[in-house]
Amino acid sequence: MTLGRLGGDEFALLCEGYGAEKATALALRILDRLNEPFHIGDQELFSSASIGIVLYPYPTDVQNAEQLMRNADSALFKAKSNGRSTYAFYSEELTSQARQRVELVTALRQALEQGQLRLHYQPIYDLRQGTISGFEALVRWQHPEKGLIAPGAFIPIAEETGLISAIDHWVLEQACNQAREWLGQGHPLGFIAVNISSRLFGNGELDLQVATILARSGLEARHLELEITESAVIQDPDAALVLLQRLRALGVQLAIDDFGTGYSSLQRLKRMNVHKLKIDQGFVRGLPDDRDDAAITRSVIGLAHNLGLKVVAEGIETAEQAAFLLAQNCDYGQGYGFARPQPGDAIDWSPSELCHGQACRSSGR
C-alpha cells in the first residue's frame, strides 16, 4: 500500500490486490477515522473526506497512469457531489460526466467574463408587520442558449473549482450597488443579505474586501448583512472568530445561515457575536403539524432570543407556517409563500398579504 500527496488537500492511495469489496471496506475505515474529532491545543476540530475509487484492470479503456488518475478524479467528483464523508466508484458513465463538468467550468468562466450572471432578490418580511425589512441576494446564470440557470446547477462546480470566490465578490458588489440605489429612491430598506462561501470566508481578507466594496458603492455598513454557515466557521474556529470580530467592527450585520444543519455548537455560537440565526427550510417545511420540526423551531427561536439574536425562518410557503412562526415570536420570514426572488427592478414593495400581525396570531397554533 502506497500513499502519496498529489497537492493541496488531495492524496492518492495505491493498493495492490484490492477488489471492490476490500476497497469499499478500506474507504469506510478511512472515512470513519477522519470523521472523529481531533484536538490542537484546547480546540476540538472536525474534518471530513470524499474518496474516489478506480479499479484496474477494469475498465479496459485505461491505457496509462494518466488515464487512471483522471478516472479516479471523476470518481472523486462524484463522491463530493453525493455529500460529505462518502465514496464513489468510477464507471464509464462518469467519463461523460467529467467531460460535461469541464464544459460547464469553461462556460462558467465565460459567464463571469461576459456578464451573464444576474442577481434576483427575495424579500425578507417582518412577520409582525408584514412589511419588507430586507432582501437576500441570490445569483442566477442567464445562459445565452439555455436561459436562466438556477444556482443549484452551477454553484457546486464553482465551489469545487474555486470560481465561487469571484462569484461571491461580484454578488457583493452588485448587491451593495442595488441597495444603495433603492435607498436613494426612498425605499425603506433595512438590509441586503449576501451569502458568503466557505472559500471566501476562509481567505482571511473578507473584511478588507467588504470595506472596499462598501466604500465604492457608498452603502452604509449597517445595511449589509453577511450570511455565513457553521461549516465555514468550524474549518478554523479561532481564525473565524477573529474575522467575525473584524467584520462586526465594520458595522455590518452577521447571520448564521442554515442553523442546526451542520456541527452546531452552543459554545461556539456564544462566542460568534452574530446578530441573527436563520432557521433552515428543512425545519420549516413540516410546520405546524410535524411535532419534531415544531419542537426544534421553538427551541431555536427561544435560544436565539435568550442570546439577544433575531431569527429568520426560510422556506415559508403557507399561511399556517407563518402563523405558527409568529406565534413563537419569530422575527422575520422569507419564502415562496411571500414572494419569489425577482430582479431588482421588478420588486413589489407592498406589505405581504400571506399572514401578519393580528391575522397571524388569531390562527396561530
Q: What is the predicted role of each segment?
A:
Residues 26, 30, 34, 68-75, ...:
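Structural preference for long, well-ordered alpha-helical segments in enzyme cores
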Residues 13-16, 54, 138-140, 195, ...:
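Short hydrophobic/aromatic beta-strand micro-patches
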Residues 1-102, 106:
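Cyclic-dinucleotide signaling modules
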Residues 58, 74, 78-120, 128, ...:
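C-di-GMP signaling machinery
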Residues 41-43, 126-129, 144-146, 185, ...:
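Flexible loop/coil segments at beta-strand boundaries within sensory signal-transduction domains
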Residues 87, 127-136, 161-239, 315:
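Catalytic core of bacterial c-di-GMP phosphodiesterases, primarily the EAL and HD-GYP domains
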Residues 89, 100-157, 195, 256, ...:
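Active-site core of bacterial EAL-family cyclic-dinucleotide phosphodiesterase domains
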Residues 14, 127, 144-145, 197-204, ...:
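EAL-family c-di-GMP phosphodiesterase catalytic domain
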